[in-house]
Amino acid sequence: MYTERYKRAAGLLLSVFLWGKGTAQQPLRFSMETLHDSLSWLCLLPADRTEGEPAGNGRKPAGMKAVARWRLDYPVYRLATGDVDGDGKDEALVGVIKPTRFYPQPARRLFLFKQVNGKIRPMWMGSRLGGILCDFRFVRPYVRTLQSTTDGKYVVADYAWDDFGLTFVRFLTGAVSRKEAAEKFASNEPEEAF
C-alpha cells in the first residue's frame, strides 16, 4: 500500500517533529544584553551552561549564543525572573523607562515576558500599577513593588498574576518614609498584610 518512499518521508517527518519537541523543552534562562543606555536585548540562554550566574547581570557570557532575543528600545533598570503565573517556567520581569499613550511622561514601567517553545513572548506590558513604580522584585508567588504616592510617601504592595495581568493582592506598608518602605521591600521575612 505505502511505497518505500512514503515510509521514509513519514519517518523523516516524525523524527523532525520529535526532535523539534525535544529541543523546545531544553531548560532556558533569561538574561539581558545591554548595547547602550536605550537599547537592550532580552535573551533566552541555555540554562545548563552557566549555572550560578545571577539573572540579569547585563552581559551575555562570551561565546554564549542566545536561543531567542527580544529587542527593548528603552532604558532598562531591572531584570528579575520567577514563576509569576505558576506554570513551572520562569518568566522575565523587565523594568523599563518609557512614556505611554495615557501617561506621556517617561516613567518606570513593568513588562512581563514568558518562554513559549524556545521563543520570548510578551505576557503583559503594563503602563501603570496602583502608584508610581520605583522598584520591583519577585517574591514567590508575588511581584513585590515599591511605589511612591503623590504626597511623597512610599508603599510596598504585592501583586499576583490573574490571566490578563497583575492584580493587587495586599499592602505590606501604609504610606511611610522611603527608608521604612525600602527596608520592608528588601526584607525576606514572611510578610503580613498591612
PLM region spans:
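Beta-propeller-forming repeat regions
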Residues: K21-F194
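A general, composition-driven signal for non-globular sequence regions
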Residues: M1-Y2, S15, D83-G86
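Bacterial N-terminal signal peptides
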Residues: G11-F17
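Bacterial N-terminal signal peptides that target proteins for export
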Residues: Y2-A10
